[in-house]
Amino acid sequence: MKLFLRSHAVLILLFLLQGLFVFFYYWFAGLHSFSHLFYILGVQLLILAGYLAYRWYKDRGVYHWLSSGQEGTDIPYLGSSVFCSELYEKQMELIRLQHQKLHETEAKLDARVTYMNQWVHQVKTPLSVINLIIQEEDEPVFEQIKKEVRQIEFGLETLLYSSRLDLFERDFKIEAVSLSELLQSVIQSYKRFFIQYRVYPKMNVCDDHQIYTDAKWLKFAIGQVVTNAVKYSAGKSDRLELNVFCDEDRTVLEVKDYGVGIPSQDIKRVFDPYYTGENGRRFQESTGIGLHLVKEITDKLNHTVDISSSPGEGTSVRFSFLTKM
């Protein structure tokens, strides 16, 4: 009702001004028969009230809809007036255009992800051949080639998951997963990486904790944290701990290294996209996308991730999982 009155405020104001004009006209014209004046003003007031009541009856659906603050795209019946009908048709046309643009955007996104997947797999094939050719070679030049190939493989994996993230809802499956088995799979996948940097993981798992997650996406997220821990520990420490423990109703995975640590001014921004910080400038191996993807993935999986660090002493990244659905 307030919105209706505000929308007709000008009309009501004009009626008041008209009443004042009639009153002063009667007064200055020497017509002091107030009974006639009040009769005229009463008729005008009755006409105005009737008009407003009619407009309210016809357009009340519009004002209820505008005042309700309802979310969603469903447009209710707005009323039978010409204004309501035209507004309803316009809204429906806008919704149809939005749906059309949404479908077009989804189609383009699907095409981009499909192209990216095909491109990554095409690049992986010659990399696999290179690995087969040089896997038995121990000369320094071949060791350097192996290192660079692994860097390309990690970059391709990051690119692949980054492109799939926009279609995450189509590409995940929540199920009970053994956290210890998942960690063993991560260690197996990165064993050459550990050897290359001479940093060796140690699992501290008391029981076989079952968590509800998507194994593929979580494995990638843990892998991103592990690779960071290894790269920033190399040459300073050969220790990397994967600790699993319970904290009330949650299971916690802690990836703890004893490397260079993260400066205090960078710790609040490590999950920002493309933020490399001081360590990224020092080591020149950071893209600033890995931890951002970790944060995005854990949020979508309804997990939490936090990070703490002491410069020169190491970094601890904790994943927290609900133990029950």
UniProtKB/Swiss-Prot annotation:
GO terms for molecular function: ATP binding; protein histidine kinase activity. CDD domains: HATPase_BceS-YxdK-YvcQ-like (cd16948). It catalyses: ATP + protein L-histidine = ADP + protein N-phospho-L-histidine. Its EC number is 2.7.13.3. It comes from the Bacteria. The chain crosses the membrane at residues 9-29, 34-54. InterPro entries: 2-comp_sensor_kinase, HATPase_C_sf, His_kinase_dom, Sig_transdc_His_kin-like_C. Residues 118-325 form the Histidine kinase domain. It is a multi-pass membrane protein. GO terms for biological process: phosphorelay signal transduction system. SUPFAM superfamilies: ATPase domain of HSP90 chaperone/DNA topoisomerase II/histidine kinase. The modification Phosphohistidine is found at residue 121. Keywords: ATP-binding, Cell membrane, Kinase, Membrane, Nucleotide-binding, Phosphoprotein, Transferase, Transmembrane, Transmembrane helix, Two-component regulatory system. It is an enzyme of class 2 (transferase). It is found in: Cell membrane. Residues 1-8, 55-325 are cytoplasmic. Residues 30-33 are extracellular. GO terms for cellular component: plasma membrane. Probable member of the two-component regulatory system YxdK/YxdJ. May activate YxdJ in response to the antibacterial protein LL-37. This is Sensor histidine kinase YxdK.
